[in-house]
């Protein structure tokens, strides 16, 4: 069975990049798209921006 955290992630779209596209930009883009939250998954250096409801 899948972890609840894995099932929560719905839309991953942009590569996170320190100094260019970080958690703040990811969060802003997710809110603009109508999601409740957004974060770089699995981390800020190698992750992608994933939005959750």
From Swiss-Prot:
Pfam families: Defensin (PF24552)
Disulfide bonds: 12-51, 16-40, 26-49, 30-50
GO terms of biological process kind: defense response to fungus; killing of cells of another organism
Signal peptide (residue range): none
Keywords: Antimicrobial, Disulfide bond, Fungicide, Plant defense
Presence of the UniProt keyword Disulfide bond in the record: yes
Protein family membership: Belongs to the DEFL family.
Name listed for the protein in its UniProt record: Putative defensin-like protein 53
Provenance organism: Arabidopsis thaliana (Mouse-ear cress)
Lineage per the UniProt record: Eukaryota, Viridiplantae, Streptophyta, Embryophyta, Tracheophyta
């Amino acid at each position: 069975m899948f972890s609840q955290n894995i099932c929560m992630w719905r839309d991953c779209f942009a590569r996170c990049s320190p100094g260019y596209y970080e958690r703040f930009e990811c969060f802003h883009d997710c809110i603009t798209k109508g999601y409740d939250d957004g974060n770089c998954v699995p981390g800020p250096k190698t992750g992608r921006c994933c939005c959750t409801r």
